[in-house]
Swiss-Prot record:
Binding site for Fe cation: H180, H241, H313, H527
UniProt protein name: Retinoid isomerohydrolase
Signal peptide residues on this chain, from the entry's feature table: none
Gene: Rpe65
Keywords: Acetylation, Cell membrane, Cytoplasm, Disease variant, Endoplasmic reticulum, Hydrolase, Iron, Isomerase, Lipid metabolism, Lipoprotein, Membrane, Metal-binding, Microsome, Palmitate, Phosphoprotein, Sensory transduction, Vision
Subunit structure: Interacts with MYO7A; this mediates light-dependent intracellular transport of RPE65.
Cellular localisation: Cytoplasm; Cell membrane; Microsome membrane
Pfam family, one: RPE65
Origin organism lineage: Eukaryota, Metazoa, Chordata, Craniata, Vertebrata
Disruption phenotype annotation: Mice exhibit changes in retinal physiology and biochemistry. Outer segment disks of rod photoreceptors are disorganized, rod function is abolished although cone function remains. Mice lack rhodopsin, but not opsin apoprotein. Furthermore, all-trans-retinyl esters over-accumulate in the retinal pigment epithelium, whereas 11-cis-retinyl esters are absent.
Amino acid sequence: MSIQIEHPAGGYKKLFETVEELSSPLTAHVTGRIPLWLTGSLLRCGPGLFEVGSEPFYHLFDGQALLHKFDFKEGHVTYHRRFIRTDAYVRAMTEKRIVITEFGTCAFPDPCKNIFSRFFSYFKGVEVTDNALVNIYPVGEDYYACTETNFITKINPETLETIKQVDLCNYISVNGATAHPHIESDGTVYNIGNCFGKNFTVAYNIIKIPPLKADKEDPINKSEVVVQFPCSDRFKPSYVHSFGLTPNYIVFVETPVKINLFKFLSSWSLWGANYMDCFESNESMGVWLHVADKKRRKYFNNKYRTSPFNLFHHINTYEDNGFLIVDLCCWKGFEFVYNYLYLANLRENWEEVKRNAMKAPQPEVRRYVLPLTIDKVDTGRNLVTLPHTTATATLRSDETIWLEPEVLFSGPRQAFEFPQINYQKFGGKPYTYAYGLGLNHFVPDKLCKMNVKTKEIWMWQEPDSYPSEPIFVSQPDALEEDDGVVLSVVVSPGAGQKPAYLLVLNAKDLSEIARAEVETNIPVTFHGLFKRS
């Protein structure tokens, strides 16, 4: 990328501070010119409450969900936010303590209860969080905020009011679902979640929610499982955050970061644990890649294998002359990256933040190429015949296909993460450009654009400025893939600056078009979408 900016003032700590919700939208001060065609709402979510009374949350993914909205109309911008009224939030506010265990924070029984009632409360089963702080996605005409459990929360995208909690277990066989479903052009939703398969072993189900039909029945009522992927360990599913989808195929990457279900069901219920306590790494399995035929709903028993890495975000997946191209934001090795995302680490002074990041898995953007047709006579050969990639796939004598990637980007402690593309037109298809959030030792301090064919990089960066995931919005009359703008929420705690602003960049070269400043701090946000008016 470019010269690394240092952060000795520690302004990034503002990303992890509690804020209050707003009673009404704020008018933003716009400099530059917002394109008049940009009409709609940028919706984002993330943690906004980092403690309840005297009880702190400990992990980045623990804070209570705050829903944000920037409205664009005729070149003007307003900003609004409200806490999502999940069970976790409402009960915490009512009891003035953390009531439901979060990703890295344990909830303990009410200290006012006697020892017998506290003991028996542990045997009521695991109480799963509905803290919907990770992403927002549409189902039919509705919008849902989500985490990665079986609960999703229906919200009103206009008022930011919470409508209701939905338990996916009531409709489909999954223990949870990722926060990164795929949405097809007709509104069909695909997602993945682990489940209990045959003989009580763990598997992964691909679920499909159809588009809204003329009968106006809630599409979630018509959810179905379309294919099932086997698990490499019958009692320890891998952590899954996203997956790949093309018009004809589904790609699932099974990493060595595992959920120990015995620990989840026993330790948690009996003496208290949190989600992070239940993760472990399989140091010998490497990574398994699975493929299924989407239309025929058939699992391919091709044994794709490669060396270990963590994976959270797929960039894009597409078909190319009998091969699948799978572009990923990887973290090298089998150790869980989330071990380094405790708030105490992220709030350290800059030199300590860098020291901690030096110990963590290192990021790399990779392209894997998966051959769909396998012939045993090719044992020992590289099966990749595409001229435009250095990625390889070698058939071994044990019938596994060993994959080596083409590296699209690699920088020491510099990650290209939270990737976005022109998804509406190029999701699941050959593409050229990806946009990402640049992490400098886990601190988000730049926005990036990558040409995945030439590996050229463009970048936006300013001192004491901490952007969010870039959201690409195509202009209505777009002729080229990158005709449009990139939107990002920037926290700017430096002297002489407003606390935060919405940044509008030209998607061609990441030059600034406009910014809309607000007189309030905005904590870290993870994911979101642009909803056109």
